[in-house]
Amino acid sequence: MEAAAMKVVSLAVSLVLILTYAHADTGTATFYTPPYVPSACFGLEEQGTMIAAASEGIYNNGASCGRMYRVTCTGPTNLGVPQPCTGNTVTVKVVDLCPSPGCQATIDLSQEAFSSIANPDAGKINIEFTEV
């Protein structure tokens, strides 16, 4: 009976992981440096350092303000740093807009958030991100 229960638990965990992975979007991330205020979403109100500026597609005229995203580095976008990823995942809060044409990524992470998932020397990385 215990073996059957373990199989059910194992299957359930696998299913959750597959569904989580299946809903992840892909894109690129860059980073910006302090000061982080003022921001488009919160003005002069500090929101910490695990924050991000969203590209116009995600920002959606401010609808994404305050939303949280789990971001994982999946690899390099250039040959400068062939293995930039640290293996970590970071959760960030959208506090700002990364406007075109200057925005070079899907999500512009704070320097601290970017550094937790990748080598800053890479400058730009491929990512998977999921709203949490």
Regions found by a protein language model. Give the residues of each.
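Secreted/periplasmic proteins
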Residues: 2-132
